Every structure is written in structure tokens, then in C-alpha cells.
Amino acid sequence: MLEATRVRNLPPYLFARIERLIAEKKEAGVDVISLGIGDPDTPTPKHIIEELYLAAQNPENHQYPSSVGMLSYRQAVAAWYARRFGVELDPKTEVVSLLGSKEGIAHISWCYVDPGDLVLVPDPGYPVYEGGTILAGGTTYKMPLKPENGFLPDLDSIPEEVARKAKLMFINYPNNPTGAVADLGFFEKVVHFAKKYEILVCHDAAYSEITFDGYRAPSFLEVKGAKDVGIEFHSLSKTYNMTGWRIGWAVGNAKAIDALGRLKSNIDSGVFQAIQYAGIKALEGPQDVVKELCDLYAQRRDLVIETLNKLGWNLSKPKGTFYIWAPVPKGFTSASFAEYLIEKAGVVITPGNGYGTNGEGYFRISLTIPTSRLKEALQRIEQHLGKVEF
């Protein structure tokens, strides 16, 4: 039976290909070290796990949850936003729970995009921005993220006819895969642009708490008027090592939050309530665990940067995310460099072209691996590459 066009149009998911490659090498007896997928290697903090255990003892929490989330969970999210960013949110109308931010990012296009509609997406960028658009029948206009512009989209370069047709704009800072950060000045430009062209801004802020060297990432919603034109997606996955728990939220524009909630009520049955209680504990409990995690990633970041720079790269230390974005050496494409490292060194990296055409010529290293294994991976890379040129 022929699949629907929307499914046939989907590109192969980047990380699915990486997982298959790892499996093939392991079956061949290779000791593979993966620096590919950004999945934290340290455990969820103990007090969050204990809260899950306690909440799971209550039989009521094993019934169907609300598709938009318990009010107490949404209140905890709103209170966290007030403490962290000074942003006031109505937990009843401006917060919705998500099965991880990925789910909401994929579904928001279903709320606003009709077949043929246009969506602005960053390139390179998280593949789900485009995937959700394709599933909704829309088309994407790629906003190039260039190093000379700090990996921020140049809004002035977007053609007038494109801007007028666009329904949504996806942005993401701190940025995956580049590690770039954005200030409030940039977000102000985005709000102005969105108001001018009546575009809904969808800011993916999943890495806002993974920052270094005293830097604190702002929320898009801190900008005056941002709630008029946008929503922000966030998650407990990266901040508290809860990727497998599948819990996050969207906040901001009440109409967009309502649309997302109505869509979800027809598709899923919400987040397991015991996990929502654990999420409340994460947001309201001790935050020193987040600082400890960032300190660990900073150490690993420094290790990678120092090693690669010794080999001939000229990399600056990113202020956010747990990724290193670097150009491939002379003579390689993104794909051929990734293939070289897996074949010669048994080390998996993510080829930059998997994030879009503007990712060609780059690769991404994830810092979510035990430091001892990271050191071994870097030793293997140094052994098989030596000095490199660009």
C-alpha cells in the first residue's frame, strides 16, 4: 500500500541514520565512541526520581491525565518563568504541557499551516522544524545561519514576497547545532519583523539553562510585545537530564497555546501525572544540580576546544548548549569526514549537512559522554588526523 505523500516527503531522520551506523559498527566488533546524539550521560537528580516514585504510588496518577497538563504543573512553569526571566504568564491560558518540546514543535505547524503555506526555518537547524512543516503540507524557506552574522538569521535579507507569505518562523537560541547565542536586541528585531508581516514566532529555548562562563540566556518573551506574536518551547530534558521522561511545555501567545491544546486533545492524552509531579519538583527544587551539570559540560567543552585547536582548528568556546560546531578539514565534506572518523577511529560525529545545506562543511560534537570516553575519542581523532589544514 502506498504511503501518504506527507510521509514519503519526509527526509530520513538524521539521528536514525546515526543510530543505524553505530549498530552496524558494534555488530562488526568495533568499540564505537559516539559524539553524535545530544543525550545527557549523567542521571536525573535523585530528588526528582524520588518524587516520581512517590507520585506513582497514588492510583489516581495512573488514570488519563489532562492533555494540556495539570494546573499545578502549569503554575510551576509560570512561577519558574517569573523567577528566571521576570516574565509573567497566566498558567490557565498561556501555558500548555508537552510530551517533550519536540512534540509541540512538530505539532504547532499543524495548528497554523495549510497545504502550500510557507514557514521560515533556520539552516542549519533542528530537523523537526522542517519535518513538522512537511507533515502539515507546508513548504520551508531556509534562513541561512552564517558565522559572519554570529549564526543569527539576517532578517533584512528575507525577500519581501517570502516574508508576506510566511505563517511561522522558527528560531532557536542557545542554538543547536552551532552553539550560538542571541541577545534581547536580536529578539526585539524578530518581534518587529513578526508584527510587520503577521508571523507567529516559535522560539525553541530547550538549551536556555545550559550556559557557561557566567552567561545567562534570555527568554524571547522578555521582549515587549513578544507574547503578541510568539510562543516559546522548553523542556526539562536538557536542564535536568530527563530526555527519556518526555515532559516540556509551550508558553506565550494565548491563542497559539489554545490552538496547540485543542490539537493535542485530539492526538494524545497528555503527560503521565507522576512525571508532571516530578517536573514540579525539578522546577521548584534545588537548582545547584543545574550549575553542577553546566560546570561538567564546561570542562568537557574546554577539553574538546583545546584538543582541536592544538590540531589546527581555531575555535572559540561556545557560551551555550553542549555542542561544539566546527569546520571540517581541507579535503573533506561533512559526510566524508564523518565516514572517515567512524571507519578509521571508531568515533561518531554528526555531519553538519544533516542540519541543512548551510551545515555543509561543518560537523557537530556532543559533550554528553563520560569524560574518560571523550578523552579517548579525542586521542583517537588526534592519532588518525594529526595536524589539519583549512
From Swiss-Prot:
It catalyses: (2S,6S)-2,6-diaminopimelate + 2-oxoglutarate = (S)-2,3,4,5-tetrahydrodipicolinate + L-glutamate + H2O + H(+). Substrate binds at residues 13, 38, 102, 126, 176, 364. Keywords: Aminotransferase, Pyridoxal phosphate, Transferase. Its EC number is 2.6.1.83. Its cofactor is pyridoxal 5'-phosphate. GO terms for molecular function: L,L-diaminopimelate aminotransferase activity; pyridoxal phosphate binding. GO terms for biological process: lysine biosynthetic process via diaminopimelate, diaminopimelate-aminotransferase pathway. PROSITE patterns: AA_TRANSFER_CLASS_1. Pfam families: Aminotran_1_2. Pyridoxal 5'-phosphate binds at residues 101-102, 126, 176, 207, 235-237, 246. The modification N6-(pyridoxal phosphate)lysine is found at residue 238. Gene3D superfamilies: Aspartate Aminotransferase, domain 1 (3.90.1150.10), Type I PLP-dependent aspartate aminotransferase-like (Major domain) (3.40.640.10). InterPro entries: Aminotransferase_I/II_large (IPR004839), DAP-NH2Trfase_DapL_Desulfo (IPR019881), DapL/ALD1 (IPR019942), LL-DAP_aminotransferase (IPR050881), NHTrfase_class1_PyrdxlP-BS (IPR004838), PyrdxlP-dep_Trfase (IPR015424), PyrdxlP-dep_Trfase_major (IPR015421), PyrdxlP-dep_Trfase_small (IPR015422). Pathway: Amino-acid biosynthesis; L-lysine biosynthesis via DAP pathway; LL-2,6-diaminopimelate from (S)-tetrahydrodipicolinate (aminotransferase route): step 1/1. PANTHER family: AMINO ACID AMINOTRANSFERASE (PTHR42832), L-GLUTAMINE--4-(METHYLSULFANYL)-2-OXOBUTANOATE AMINOTRANSFERASE (PTHR42832:SF3). Involved in the synthesis of meso-diaminopimelate (m-DAP or DL-DAP), required for both lysine and peptidoglycan biosynthesis. Catalyzes the direct conversion of tetrahydrodipicolinate to LL-diaminopimelate. HAMAP family: DapL_aminotrans_1. Homodimer. Belongs to the class-I pyridoxal-phosphate-dependent aminotransferase family. LL-diaminopimelate aminotransferase subfamily. This is LL-diaminopimelate aminotransferase. It comes from Carboxydothermus hydrogenoformans (strain ATCC BAA-161 / DSM 6008 / Z-2901). The lineage of its organism: Bacteria, Bacillati, Bacillota, Clostridia, Thermoanaerobacterales. The gene is dapL.
